[in-house]
Amino acid sequence: MDQDSYSLMRGGLVHRLLHATGALGGSAHLSLWLALLLVAVSLLPMLLLTAVDGTLLPKHGAMSLLGDYATLARLLLALPLLVIAAPRSDALLRNAFRQLSHASLVPARRLPRLHALLQQVRRGRDGWVPEALCVLIAVLPLFLSGTALSLLPGVIDWRLDGAVLTPAGRWYEWVAVPLFRLVALLWLWRYLLWTWLLWRLPRSGLVLHAEHPDGAGGLAFLGIAQERFAVLSMAGGLLLAGACLNHITWLGQTLYDVRHLLAGYVIGATALLVAPLLLLMPLLMRTKRHALYRFDALGNRAAALFDQRWQAGAASAADEDSLLDHGDASAFADFSGVYKGLASMAVVPLDRWNLLWIALYALLPLCPLVLLAMSVDELVSKLVGILV
């Protein structure tokens, strides 16, 4: 399929299994149905099992399933988010792949080098070994540590009956958590493929023009594409928000106690998502530096000619003309505008809006903590105190 040639998500062991079952040829809303299926497989058995043993609904001093906000955030929010966001993210990444091939960024004689690079990415996407390793990593903690549960000290947990896993706890540890890990690892593998592509891209023979109106030598579209991976930071933010809410609810901690953790997560997640674009910085810096050298020399010649014509003295034909009526001033102003645009060229294909959106993806899941950690009246009074 032609569209799959430029797709980063479609391919690999899991995609081939879905294709073999005929699932990919059905509904146009496949990702929604798949997300519902994964949520049902991971969560419904636990709802039934906890309802049977009496740990479904909240009890005083004991954390029930419906009171375990970390589990609900993982299975009800983060898991379907990663599945549903994949097609939309893939569409934008696919456009970025096409842009690399069709935007005249590579001279015709070097196109085979770029096509070979894209083919290597497709082979990495379609290979069964990476996704088989993802499956292995997803289940490996079960065999290494015996239990992968993260328990709150001094809190009775719905997953344990004494020191033994309950049936719902076994389903959570053996099915739900590995399933979530697998989906997250598939996303991370695509992210590593994309990062590898950005690392190799400067070696593919790109010819950039510092005068490009996008302010990034023609590579600004990569910053837009990078935003698509911010869904990873949103999913991580949901997990962190659920864990912090558990600590606030069951351990008596406050939002102030976890402020450094929350701030560190937003800053760290944003930095990790922006970091791959820094691999293009040497190429963009070199392009900008060489262009500044050329335009400096050209500007010197243009300024000298301008001075010679209009400021060299009165005994010339220039005295008979008006500077306002002549095209020299307009041409020099146009040149100055081009030079200023060149001097402000970004050395990373990322503008402030790209950075803002990436940071917001990490921040938004944490915002409900503010509403849950304090009353609305208290929040309004503090806002009024700040503003007034």
Residue ranges and their predicted role:
Residues 1-148, 182-195, 199-200, 204-388:
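Intrinsically disordered cytosolic tails
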Residues 149-164:
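Short, flexible helix-coil linker/hinge segments at the edges of structured domains or between repeats
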Residues 160-180:
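Short aromatic-rich membrane-water interface segments that cap or initiate transmembrane helices
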